[in-house]
């Protein structure tokens, strides 16, 4: 494939030149590439059998020139929010949820729900698959606790949350919390005492209490916007933001919102909404807490739709306490999914599924600028998360 100016091509060589010491000293990013689903000119899914998916570990010591540390042949899925993987707070392991696979029935291909969660040993040189956890149906968004002792996995089809115990690379399901509705993502508050889960089809966010490895659904829900797909919590734990997708996981031509939940109120509730565009999916907040972004699909995978745009875009938000305002927008690539900030908050990466690359933005305070640089990945980036350090 011909690379455009400013695009940094990766070598997908089997031999990996980086040492483990270099990897562990630098921020690194995990990326899930799904090679099973694309779309035709009428916007209909074109499916392929599994076997070409990959999970990448990338060294971001130089954010403008990311380097590949590992390319693991592991199945993962674009079906769901782009947060179906995460890196432990200490950087020792990563988890990847395999949400949906594809099988052949007669002459047709069909999507089938999976239940697997991959455990990747990031201390190994190079990083490698350390184990497989069998969870519930359609594991999707997931997050580690701030201490790294447990992780929570949103099981969409099972309408539950799996609680995983983490002891090195020994990861086990120790509990399953029934939620009563389809759950797409779950995140912890910074103090580790609460968690928030998006009830996608119910248009709500559920509140959970966390006490050690005991996770309890409080039966308290916050009504947000339509089809909340993704949720994040500010670094100070005072507010949460939801990506209200509006179109049940895709664009529909209508503008959608980010809801702001004040977590200091009792009970927590929505205090404002910001219009961000058609089909927000990726969602991220800077480690400094003053800038957030919503990644907008904008019908970029549906050429036949009246609302089609060739490119998706990123809506940049200024966060000042519990006040969130829209600053600007930037075009990115086709069907943008994940957004991640580097640990120092100075750079933002946005994955473009159809373009098979990431856009790189510079962040200076609340000023976000497009560097004009992109880096290619060997596949279609469906999800991404960043290490904490």
Question: Where does each model-flagged region fall?
Answer:
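Bacterial N-terminal signal peptides
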Residues: 9-19
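Bacterial N-terminal signal peptides that target proteins for export
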Residues: 1-10
């Amino acid at each position: 494939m011909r690379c455009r100016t400013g695009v940094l091509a990766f070598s997908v060589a089997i031999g990996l030149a980086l040492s483990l010491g270099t990897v562990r000293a630098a921020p690194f990013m995990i990326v899930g590439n799904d090679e099973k689903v694309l779309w035709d000119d009428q916007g209909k899914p074109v499916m392929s059998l599994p076997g070409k998916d990959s999970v990448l570990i990338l060294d971001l010591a130089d954010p403008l020139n990311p380097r590949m540390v590992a390319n693991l042949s592991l199945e993962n899925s674009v079906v769901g929010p782009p947060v179906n993987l995460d890196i432990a707070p200490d950087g020792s392991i990563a988890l990847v949820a395999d949400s949906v696979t594809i099988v052949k029935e007669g002459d047709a291909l069909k999507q089938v729900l999976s239940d697997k969660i991959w455990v990747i040993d990031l201390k190994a040189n190079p990083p490698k698959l350390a184990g497989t956890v069998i969870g519930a149906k359609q594991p999707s968004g997931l997050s580690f606790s701030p201490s790294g002792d447990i992780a929570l996995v949103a099981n969409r089809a099972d309408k539950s949350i799996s609680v995983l115990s983490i002891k090195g690379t020994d990861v086990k399901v120790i509990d399953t919390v029934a939620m009563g509705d389809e759950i797409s993502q779950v995140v912890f508050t910074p103090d580790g005492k609460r968690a928030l889960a998006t009830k996608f089809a119910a248009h709500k966010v559920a509140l959970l209490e966390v006490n050690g490895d005991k996770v309890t659904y409080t039966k308290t829900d916050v009504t947000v916007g339509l089809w909340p797909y993704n949720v994040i919590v500010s670094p100070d734990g005072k507010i949460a933001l939801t990506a209200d997708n509006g179109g049940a996981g895709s664009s529909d031509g209508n503008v959608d919102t980010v809801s702001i939940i004040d977590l200091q109120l009792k009970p927590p509730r929505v205090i404002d909404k910001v219009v961000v565009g058609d089909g927000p999916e990726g969602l991220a907040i800077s480690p400094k807490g003053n800038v957030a972004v919503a990644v907008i699909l904008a019908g970029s995978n549906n050429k036949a739709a009246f609302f089609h745009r060739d490119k998706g875009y990123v809506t940049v938000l200024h966060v000042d306490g519990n006040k969130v305002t829209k600053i600007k927008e930037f075009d990115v690539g086709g069907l943008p999914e994940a957004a991640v900030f580097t640990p120092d908050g100075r750079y933002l990466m946005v994955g473009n599924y159809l373009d098979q690359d990431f856009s790189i933005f510079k962040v200076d305070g609340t000023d976000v600028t497009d560097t004009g640089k992109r880096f290619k990945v060997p596949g279609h980036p469906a999800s991404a998360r960043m290490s904490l350090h």
